[in-house]
Amino acid sequence: MITVVKRNGRIEPLDITKIQKYTKDATDNLEGVSQSELEVDARLQFRDKITTEEIQQTLIKTAVDKIDIDTPNWSFVASRLFLYDLYHKVSGFTGYRHLKEYFENAEEKGRILKGFKEKFDLEFLNSQIKPERDFQFNYLGIKTLYDRYLLKDANNNPIELPQHMFMSIAMFLAQNEQEPNKIALEFYEVLSKFEAMCATPTLANARTTKHQLSSCYIGSTPDNIEGIFDSYKEMALLSKYGGGIGWDFSLVRSIGSYIDGHKNASAGTIPFLKIANDVAIAVDQLGTRKGAIAVYLEIWHIDVMEFIDLRKNSGDERRRAHDLFPALWVCDLFLKRVLEDAMWTLFDPYECKDLTELYGQDFEKRYLEYEKDPKIIKEYINAKDLWKKILMNYFEAGLPFLAFKDNANRCNPNAHAGIIRSSNLCTEIFQNTAPNHYYMQIEYTDGTIEFFEEKELVTTDSNITKCANKLTSTDILKGKPIYIATKVAKDGQTAVCNLASINLSKINTEEDIKRVVPIMVRLLDNVIDLNFYPNRKVKATNLQNRAIGLGVMGEAQMLAEHQIAWGSKEHLEKIDALMEQISYHAIDTSANLAKEKGVYKDFENSEWSKGIFPIDKANNEALKLTEKGLFNHACDWQGLREKVKANGMRNGYLMAIAPTSSISILVGTTQTIEPIYKKKWFEENLSGLIPVVVPNLNVETWNFYTSAYDIDAKDLIKAAAVRQKWIDQGQSLNVFLRIENASGKTLHDIYTLAWKLGLKSTYYLRSESPSIDEKSVLDRSVECFNCQ
């Protein structure tokens, strides 16, 4: 006889009827699974004095091991079994306690922020919770939710169930609304039905005492020691609270540059990048993983060759930074020179820093002037040779990322208020940034203070004229001896990404888009006001432009379920129509919110204020990819232009397509805008390898689920170009290539096509060998946790 050790330590005979109740519920109404098969295979592993916990884990593992291409529903069996166990751990029974009890318990344990639940009718909201929606999770989805998002106590025991999580997030984000119960319910409905999902930081931290809700930050380093080290401090603080970072180093003077009038005194950007690398390692993200920092450099910078080699395993280790993610800020002129097989001139930004402030024709004019200037430092390289080096590194290591400076800035709705200097870690965010500005603070012996620009000429009482940054305590100005001269900073701009994604596998009709997009735009706008900001500059920037990034996920599932082949004419037309609707309703909602809550501060003189939308600045070649003409749009764009001019816009930036790997796993759909990896693969988890089958795989969808490696990479680029027409920011776009199909010409054609079609960036180049192990494990180690 087999005996069982209960949770309370009591030993009693195994009661198979109790197990049968759970196995029956776990297999009910699921095709291709068998209650008896589950019980028989699990019982083979039972032993005397087995614990109830071990029985539960054995049942779950038995179901997980049965997940396969022809039996994908075992994933839902495993999920249900996991949920039954979770209910008992959290509630003490198979079900949900009252919402009020959940809040009181979580507050008592210090895991939920006190003070916002009082703004709501807890009886009403408790009555709206739908526990049955838990059964939407497949096994990997519920495991991901448990491991990354559900709240736990100090001993790592779960204290939260999925629907309570969704409701408390909804409440937190609706707390300042005029009708908080109504808006919270709208947020809950969309999130809990998996129609859309917030990015990882919002899901994990909304409702908690550490409500850092933003995914990524983008900043810029000035060319002085004070500014460089202030940047490290800022990166450290941002990383501490779990933010992914994109940082522009293009202003930092190159190797061989001048320092204090001495030529060849500068060691260039690389030593400073090594320190940034150490910041990423030292300031791990809440103790869970090392920081993630992408560093950007303009392609005309003299240090570009070393920058490309930043992560190489060979060479001088003092010039390597293996934990950074290098990205190149590529201008049109460089790629024109590549196509012309012409020479490319590299400059020192110390002598031509205005190039970082210019793009398009203004940049080209100034660049040509610098080329003709005999007085400044220059280096020359054949543009095609530099391009080959970039592409070779891209193929070998997937890096450096490529981002196209002119494409990004041409379509910047806030070009009147600054310039886009780089993207973020995942290359989908494009917003204005600016480095700190430094000036001289002169403190006199009488305690008074005066300020000067660094290079401002000042005449001392000794009749000596010098730059303000050369003043010392030996100088006297207007009869007042100087006590000390110090450099102080005026904050620049560090951009913020607040992200969420529409699930196209569920939301793909005009009616549903019209219903869901306004809810998610409002939710993201509320994130801005309720966010915890690591420093003042970040908050000021976010409140200045009120940037959000609404994206999409589940495109491959949506196409398969509509029996549309990837890269086909129908594919391009379908996503064109969907993205138009999403863009239209996102802009419309922001205009409505502007009337309700006020416009963003930089609205005046923006492209929005002139009625100029992303589609109005779309790339001409991209427009030719679908047959929709200029006057053949489904939406009333002219009416919306007039509305925006009258109302204003609540948000300076609206749309961006992020990677979504975690949240797409959570809701059981395909990742972001990408084709599938394989029909079946394995995800690595704390529990081991978990088999995963693409969603809703059946005879109707089988032929329409095509591996990314079996799709022409140019079709990925063309699909991205169609989406980009409607997006004011960018897309996190991976390119997939089989090794046997790779060549210099292939890579050249792919990435020049991306540039020509108006894309703003590409993310990783993922290559795969022709022989793939049957137990293919998807490598997510290189992915940004925060944009997921």
UniProtKB/Swiss-Prot annotation:
Could you name the active-site residues? 424 (proton acceptor), 426 (cysteine radical intermediate), 428 (proton acceptor)
Gene Ontology annotations of biological process type: deoxyribonucleotide biosynthetic process
Binding-site residues, GDP: 200, 424, 428, 661-663
Enumerate the catalysed reactions.
a 2'-deoxyribonucleoside 5'-diphosphate + [thioredoxin]-disulfide + H2O = a ribonucleoside 5'-diphosphate + [thioredoxin]-dithiol
Return the GO cellular component terms, semicolon-separated: ribonucleoside-diphosphate reductase complex
Give the site residues for Important for electron transfer: 763-764
Which Gene3D superfamilies does this chain map to? 3.20.70.20
Q: Which NCBIfam families match?
A: NrdE_NrdA, PRK08447.1
* UniProt name for this protein: Ribonucleoside-diphosphate reductase subunit alpha
